Amino acid sequence: MKHIFIINPCAGGEDHSQTIADEVKTMDVTAEIYITLGEKDATRYVEDYCRQHPCENVRFYACGGDGTLNEVVSGAIGHEGAEVTCYPCGSGNDYVRYWDGVDFHHIKGLIEAPAVEVDVMKVCYYDGPNLKVCYALNTMNYGFEAEVCRAMDDVRRKPFIGGRMAYTTGIVKSLFAGRHNPCRFTVDGRLWKEGDLLLASMANGRYEGGGFLSAPRSKNDDGLLEITAIRPISIVRFASIIGDYKSGKYLDRTDLQDIVSHCRGRQVTIEHDSPFYIGIDGELLRGNYFEVENLPRVLRFAVPKK
């Protein structure tokens, strides 16, 4: 098997290229290193490589955050000989938190890791008259969470309020602008929610925002999306539940049943007359209609042993 390390030199506000390259050179494997040139470059590179080497077994190492991992997965999806794993060095690194206690920071462990089959979300959406397709590995968010992603983009690389604090900073900024989000929401062809929502999320992973356990019951290989919606609430009530939202305990609180809804499904649509933002693995898309289909076990993802 060939091993290709795809490094985002801007991930996490620090260039890890040399550290990773030095460790890779000590490994007795056939390996290459590719430094990304900008947004979506990882997807382009992986797609091109798989197209040019259709019979080759290859493992791609996404060296960056969840956005870099998403780009690598988007390029590898559908190519039979391709596997993916992650060396997490971004600002979030949430997808790999699914495997609690597993260390993804050792190159040797990643190279020797067995691959498991995981689900991937296929997302079709309209950007104006044009239908576009992309993929999500970890989470998709509507409403408040997407507004948080927008705010995060503004502060991600700023000192003190950026980096690992970016998600918390985004929450504070969005409290005053992103608490009422109208939409029509269907699950497996049936109307689930219509009207104002604080937020809605669809997940195969469990964590987002640098450690918020927003989908504690999710499984990434069962073919089902973990779907949660929360109705608009006051800032005071929001402040009273944010701790349990971060720890994942909010789904167990009976006093939140009037505002929290939860279900599982394979296919979701979200629509509104006016364009809105959706967060996909921490990145933003804009449209007025999104269709999400969970593709069961379509990606081989390497997970180191504990």
Please annotate each region the language model reported.
Residues M1-C63, N70, S74, G101:
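ATP/NTP phosphate-donor binding region
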Residues N141, E145, S201-A215, L284:
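Glycine-rich phosphate/pyrophosphate-binding beta-alpha loops
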Residues E145-V148, K193-G195, Y207-G211, I235-A239:
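Short acidic/glycine-rich loop or secondary-structure boundary segments that cap or lie
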Residues R157-A166, E208-G210, P216-R237:
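Gly/Ser/Thr-rich active-site loops/lids in small-molecule metabolic enzymes
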Residues R44, E71-V72, D94-Y95, E147, ...:
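Phosphate- and divalent-cation-binding pockets in alpha/beta enzyme and binding domains
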Residues I4, G12, T36, G78-L198:
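Catalytic core of DAGKc-family lipid kinases
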Residues V187-G189, E194, K219-N220, A229-K306:
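ATP/nucleoside-binding phosphotransfer catalytic cores, i.e., glycine-rich phosphate-binding loops
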